[in-house]
Amino acid sequence: MNTRRALAFIFCTVTLDVLALGVMIPVLPTLVLGFMGGDTASAAEMFGLFATAWGLMQFLCSPLLGALSDRYGRRPVILISCLGLGLDYIFMAIAPSLTLLFVGRIISGITAATISTAFAYIADVTPPDGRAKAFGLVGMAFGLGFVVGPALGGLLGGLDPRLPFWLSAAACLANAAFGWFVLPESLPPERRMAFAWKRANPVGSLNLLRSQRPLLGLAAIDFIVNVAHQVLPSVFVLYAGYRYGWSETTVGLTLAFVGFCAALVQGLVVG
């Protein structure tokens, strides 16, 4: 296997997936606000439910997809996740009601296993002393996607609030097609594990953390960081529009700066 080429594809995959997510951040709250009749308070509560549903589906389904990647390999899980996200964004682009838009976020949470599987892929193909640097590069890709994504989403959302969803769909589907031809499998058959439901559920994953105290501490830190991080996209767009009258473009450019800072830290500090 050409490790450099494989890591380059994983870098591009993470960048495109986060870009596809980022382009929606400036416009999805606006769509919810429209469905709620312009009531900012109700829209904020509903968008919070959107974010909760997405996170809950990830919590429930990520262990399952992780166990499937241990059994069948990383490649099919990554490609199916990219394909599923692309189809989901098309569904959200044409959703005529708030209910169907909510269903779209649930589907997105179910299929959003690309990032975690990408980290498993990196662990498969890099030596232990090089993993911190490789993980740092993936973190930089994450930040890069959040630089370009919100900026594009804000600019396109000013033209049509549905347009960023079509761009997200195109990015994910193109990435899935590209990966079909260039992404090799990283987990050889002799290293694969039998599928077991005790590992393929959130409770099993939490039991694993409990048995490894260093991992438990890191997981607690990551949980706190993500709680703080998820507050920003959940309320910032609506708050900035209500308090300061910011447009989708202004919000998108502001969040792009946040993504730039994240990419800088991940790329230069980690590893």
Question: Across the structure, where does each feature detected by a protein language model lie?
Answer:
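Cytoplasmic helix-loop-helix junction between adjacent transmembrane helices
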Residues: 104-143
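Conserved MFS/SLC helix-loop-helix module at the cytosolic interface between two early adjacent transmembrane helices
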Residues: 59-98
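Helix-loop-helix hairpin linking two adjacent transmembrane segments in secondary transporters
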Residues: 141-181
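Short amphipathic helix-loop junctions that connect adjacent transmembrane helices
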Residues: 27-44, 234-250
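Juxtamembrane intracellular "pre-TM" segments in multi-pass secondary transporters
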Residues: 184-221
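Central cavity-lining transmembrane alpha-helices of secondary-active solute carriers
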Residues: 49-65, 256-267
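Pair of pore-lining "gating" transmembrane helices in MFS-fold secondary transporters
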Residues: 3-30, 34, 212-232
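Hydrophobic core of transmembrane alpha-helices in multi-pass small-molecule transporters
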Residues: 15, 88, 99-113
